[in-house]
Amino acid sequence: MATRTQARGAVVELLYAFESGNEEIKKIASSMLEEKKIKNNQLAFALSLFNGVLEKINEIDALIEPHLKDWDFKRLGSMEKAILRLGAYEIGFTPTQNPIIINECIELGKLYAEPNTPKFLNAILDSLSKKLTQKPLN
């Protein structure tokens, strides 16, 4: 049985594929998650995160951008965008506690991104979580 951490990792992979131009990923997300042994409650959790991010992607990007300071959102790598979008979605639109979300995103950054990415993710998501003190937004 997959853990929530594994489910989040699979969601980041789906978001990465979507950001890279694979529009078909929406249609096959469920089967891809099942191939990764994400089933039952974790499958429902992963699909709710994936679909939630896609449904609110413009709003999520608008939440992230003010916290980037000297960075241009469009110039971020696809993996960094995927992790930030997942983290921002969970911070803004789910009841999961912010420290848990930020820690999970840092760990995903260690797994999937460049060596300096976890510090970057921590700074952005921490700043965002402090701004969004009332949860959830939806």
Curated annotation (Swiss-Prot):
Record keywords: RNA-binding, Transcription, Transcription antitermination, Transcription regulation
One BP annotation, GO: DNA-templated transcription termination
Keyword Nucleotide-binding appears in the UniProt entry: no
GO cellular component, as recorded: cytosol
InterPro entries tied to this protein: NusB-like_sf (IPR035926), NusB_fam (IPR011605), NusB_RsmB_TIM44 (IPR006027)
Disulfide bonds: none
Biological function: Involved in transcription antitermination. Required for transcription of ribosomal RNA (rRNA) genes. Binds specifically to the boxA antiterminator sequence of the ribosomal RNA (rrn) operons.
UniProt record similarity statement: Belongs to the NusB family.
Name of this chain's protein: Transcription antitermination protein NusB
Organism: Helicobacter pylori (strain ATCC 700392 / 26695) (Campylobacter pylori)
